[in-house]
Amino acid sequence: MQTTGALLISPALIRSCTRGLIRPVSASFLSRPEIQSVQPSYSSGPLQVARREFQTSVVSRDIDTAAKFIGAGAATVGVAGSGAGIGTVFGSLIIGYARNPSLKQQLFSYAILGFALSEAMGLFCLMVAFLILFAM
């Protein structure tokens, strides 16, 4: 049977590993003073802690780009809904005016209010689509 001491990895072996494979936890383990004081003579300088930079692969960037386009397309659907809402508002204005011409001014003011709200929602959806595409 092997003892637990034989399973431990020596600090020299850990230092000789590739920098990309050293994890931040092991880097903090290596930066303890008792391990640095027992450095072999062949290591000329102090132990350099490996820094991991944020790197993305080509596949990950492609997935992010596809997600941007899907999100922007979903936000653009709201612009089409705005167009349908504007058509409904003015269609209802025509029907209401045909039924009761004496309410022309009140119906027109409600139609303008409905148009403004519908157009505002469409512009908001378009703004979100542009934010998804160009700000993220």
From Swiss-Prot:
Gene Ontology BP term (one): proton transmembrane transport
InterPro entries linked: ATP_synth_F0_csu, ATP_synth_F0_csu_DDCD_BS, ATP_synth_F0_csu_sf, ATPase_proteolipid_c-like_dom, F/V-ATP_Csub_sf
Residues the record lists as N6,N6,N6-trimethyllysine modifications: K104
UniProt signal peptide: none
Location in or out of the cell: Mitochondrion membrane
Residue stretches spanning the membrane: 77-97, 112-132
Site for Reversibly protonated during proton transport, residues: E119
Transit peptide: 1-61
Catalytic activity: H(+)(in) = H(+)(out)
Chief localization: mitochondrion
Organism superkingdom: Eukaryota
Known disease link: This protein is the major protein stored in the storage bodies of animals or humans affected with ceroid lipofuscinosis (Batten disease).
Function: Subunit c, of the mitochondrial membrane ATP synthase complex (F(1)F(0) ATP synthase or Complex V) that produces ATP from ADP in the presence of a proton gradient across the membrane which is generated by electron transport complexes of the respiratory chain. ATP synthase complex consist of a soluble F(1) head domain - the catalytic core - and a membrane F(1) domain - the membrane proton channel. These two domains are linked by a central stalk rotating inside the F(1) region and a stationary peripheral stalk.
PANTHER family membership: ATP SYNTHASE F(0) COMPLEX SUBUNIT C1, MITOCHONDRIAL (PTHR10031:SF51), ATP SYNTHASE LIPID-BINDING PROTEIN, MITOCHONDRIAL (PTHR10031)
Subunit comment: Homooctamer; the c-ring consists of eight c subunits forming a circle, and each subunit adopts a hairpin shape. Component of the ATP synthase complex composed at least of ATP5F1A/subunit alpha, ATP5F1B/subunit beta, ATP5MC1/subunit c (homooctomer), MT-ATP6/subunit a, MT-ATP8/subunit 8, ATP5ME/subunit e, ATP5MF/subunit f, ATP5MG/subunit g, ATP5MK/subunit k, ATP5MJ/subunit j, ATP5F1C/subunit gamma, ATP5F1D/subunit delta, ATP5F1E/subunit epsilon, ATP5PF/subunit F6, ATP5PB/subunit b, ATP5PD/subunit d, ATP5PO/subunit OSCP.
Protein name in UniProt: ATP synthase F(0) complex subunit C1, mitochondrial
Organism, scientific name: Bos taurus
Phylogenetic lineage: Eukaryota, Metazoa, Chordata, Craniata, Vertebrata
Gene expressing this chain: ATP5MC1
